[in-house]
């Protein structure tokens, strides 16, 4: 079968639709930001680059913003449109925004952490400030408590990032040992074979391919959470790459992604939630193909007819390395798990403090003004 590629400028819409009229509403789940070993990392720039209309909701009322995101989502769901929910890595039950690809619309939390307003204010359609509905007198009464809680939340997050950074350092020690057993010629052959299978009958129809980025998973107060199954729900072919640390999984993805770009295909890249400089998944929507790192903490095993496992440890490594360094690997594994556990605990504490802070803001809401504000926001965005 020859594939002729036609790309869309609309965010994450260059994909094969498996159903047409009468399709059921689809909500896909992603993370826009991450609690990583590099600190708080946001991919909000990708939204600004690829979406025509970006709205932001700013303000201190996280729970209320979450409700508004879901109300706007519900409006577009009634139109049988696909919606992307962008979850908050510090509380995955809360949203940082939504995207409606077919409308070219995004509604994003305008918090200071993702920097969307500070960096991209000229490209924002409209900014809505929910703090306009707060009784400032009530907030002044609680000023010291608010400032103390804000500082505590920041310190707890910084502590978590330090733990994740230490975990990454330990992980890199494992990588170094495994890399010593790596046969790079074999790894290159695996990549070349995969590229040949994917691209041998592609006819390039457009230059300047679109490259998009989001996180499929994140370190959260509940541990590592991923939405791989949601994101790949309509993908026909999934290559699940297994292997040890340092077995070249991310390198394979980067090379395949580059092959795709070179022949004019759009690519969706999903950085690692711990190390955002590494890739954990790519999707080539026009081919309905995903290549996934199927190892912990996001273990993916073949469950669908189109799933295929590529085991880099079996194909490209001297497996005696594990016998040689058996105890060392075990010690590193235990140390890594401990750092990640501590980082998760700190995120849990930060979430608890944030919930207390949220309660203070909630008690300062002028319900009449707030209701008017919500109606204004929803009417403007869904018009």
PLM feature spans:
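Glycine-rich phosphate-binding P-loop
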Residues: 55-72, 237-257
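Internal, well-ordered alpha/beta segment that forms a basic, Gly-enriched binding/recognition surface
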Residues: 121, 125-161
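Conserved nucleotide-sensing/catalytic segment adjacent to the nucleotide-binding pocket
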Residues: 77-134, 261-337
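An accessory alpha-helical subdomain
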Residues: 145-197, 328-331, 335-377
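N-terminal pre-Walker A segment at the start of P-loop NTPase domains
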Residues: 22-42, 201-229
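N-terminal amphipathic/basic-hydrophobic helices that include classical n-h-c signal peptides
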Residues: 1-23
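N-terminal ordered "arm"
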Residues: 49-85, 108
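Phosphate-binding P-loop
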Residues: 46-51, 229-236
């Amino acid at each position: 079968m020859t594939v002729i590629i036609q790309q869309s400028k609309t965010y994450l819409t260059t994909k094969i639709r498996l159903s047409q009229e009468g399709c059921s509403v689809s909500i896909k789940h992603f993370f826009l930001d991450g609690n990583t070993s590099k600190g708080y990392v946001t991919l909000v720039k990708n939204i600004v680059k690829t979406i025509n209309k970006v709205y932001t909701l700013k303000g201190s009322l996280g729970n209320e913003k979450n409700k508004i995101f879901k109300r706007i989502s519900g409006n577009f769901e009634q139109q049988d449109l696909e919606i992307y929910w962008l979850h908050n890595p510090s509380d995955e039950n809360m949203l940082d925004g939504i995207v409606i690809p077919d409308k070219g619309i995004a509604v994003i939390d305008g918090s200071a952490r993702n920097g969307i307003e500070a960096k991209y204010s000229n490209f924002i359609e409209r900014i809505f400030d929910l703090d306009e509905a707060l009784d400032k007198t009530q907030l002044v009464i609680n000023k010291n408590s608010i400032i103390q809680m804000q500082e505590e939340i920041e310190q707890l997050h910084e502590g978590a990032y330090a733990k994740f950074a230490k975990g990454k350092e330990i992980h890199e020690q494992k990588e170094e040992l495994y890399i010593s057993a790596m046969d790079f010629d074999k790894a290159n052959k695996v990549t070349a074979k995969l590229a040949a299978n994917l691209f041998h009958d592609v006819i390039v129809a457009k230059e300047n391919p679109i490259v998009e980025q989001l996180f499929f998973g994140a370190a959260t107060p509940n541990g590592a959470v991923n939405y791989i199954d949601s994101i790949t729900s309509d993908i026909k072919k999934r290559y699940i790459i297994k292997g040890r640390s340092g077995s070249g999984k991310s390198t394979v993805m980067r090379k395949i992604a580059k092959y795709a770009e070179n022949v004019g295909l759009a690519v969706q890249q999903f950085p690692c939630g711990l190390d955002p400089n590494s890739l954990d998944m790519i999707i080539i929507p026009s081919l309905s193909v995903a290549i996934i790192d199927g190892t912990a903490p996001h273990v993916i095993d073949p469950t669908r007819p189109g799933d295929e496992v590529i085991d880099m440890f079996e194909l490209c490594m001297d497996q005696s390395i594990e016998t040689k360094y058996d105890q060392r690997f075990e010690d590193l594994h235990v140390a890594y798990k401990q750092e990640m556990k501590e980082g998760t605990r700190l995120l849990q504490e930060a979430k608890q403090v944030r919930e207390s802070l949220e309660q203070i803001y909630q008690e300062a809401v002028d319900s009449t003004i707030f209701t008017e504000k919500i109606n204004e926001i929803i009417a403007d965005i869904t018009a």
